[in-house]
Regions:
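Acidic (Asp/Glu)-rich catalytic clusters
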Residues: 1-9, 55-62
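A charged N-terminal "starter" segment
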Residues: 2-10, 143-145, 151-159
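Glycine-rich active-site/cofactor-binding loop and its immediate structural neighborhood
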Residues: 3-4, 9-37, 41
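Short amphipathic alpha-helical segments with coiled-coil-like heptad repeat character
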Residues: 18, 121-122, 157-158
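Catalytic alpha/beta core domains of metabolic enzymes, predominantly
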Residues: 24, 30-129, 135-150
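Flexible, glycine/charged-enriched surface loops at secondary-structure junctions
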Residues: 97, 159-160
Length: 160
């Protein structure tokens, strides 16, 4: 990487993958940008080992976001919560580091992230709409479901 200083507005950040397409840790680039006091969003992170490698090379001055892909991890049948828990504990030593819950798949992920003390969670609009339903009782859900069944049965024009 060219070691010249980048002219960069402090209100912006650069997104850098944790590894390149060959699986090599991008530590050299992360460290160089971080040492130039450029805010970073380090992305495509999946586990606490990757978080630890990142933290070992950071200065404690400039803001860094570590984006852990919870939904994609869950898609493999693995629970992302233990990795988040470990990563958040590791990051507590750094006031400038925030952990981001990326790749939200379901509304419950919001509660998981909140319970763990995750700093940031990116939530798509479709999930936000579902979060608005939080607090409904199972009885309310039963009645809503039965009403949908009734509407569907009327649309089918079946006679019983």
């Amino acid at each position: 990487m060219n070691t010249r200083k980048w002219k960069f507005k402090q209100s912006r950040s650069i997104k850098v993958q944790v590894t390149n397409s060959k699986g090599k840790f991008m530590g050299k680039i992360i460290k160089e940008l971080n040492n130039q006091n450029i805010k970073l969003n380090i992305t495509a992170v999946y586990n606490a080992k990757q978080t630890e490698k990142i933290l070992k090379i950071l200065n404690k001055k400039i803001k860094v976001i570590i984006s852990i892909f919870a939904g994609r991890a869950g898609d493999t049948g693995k629970d992302p919560v233990p990795e988040f828990s470990k990563s958040i504990k590791l990051a507590k030593r750094f006031k400038n580091v925030e952990i981001l819950w990326a790749s939200v798949r379901e509304p419950y992920n919001y509660l998981q992230a909140k319970q763990l003390g995750c700093h940031i969670i990116t939530i798509p609009p479709s999930i936000i709409e579902k979060i608005k339903k939080f607090g409904k009782s199972f009885d309310q859900l039963t009645q809503e479901t039965v009403n949908v069944f009734l509407i569907d049965s009327k649309k089918s024009n079946f006679k019983i």
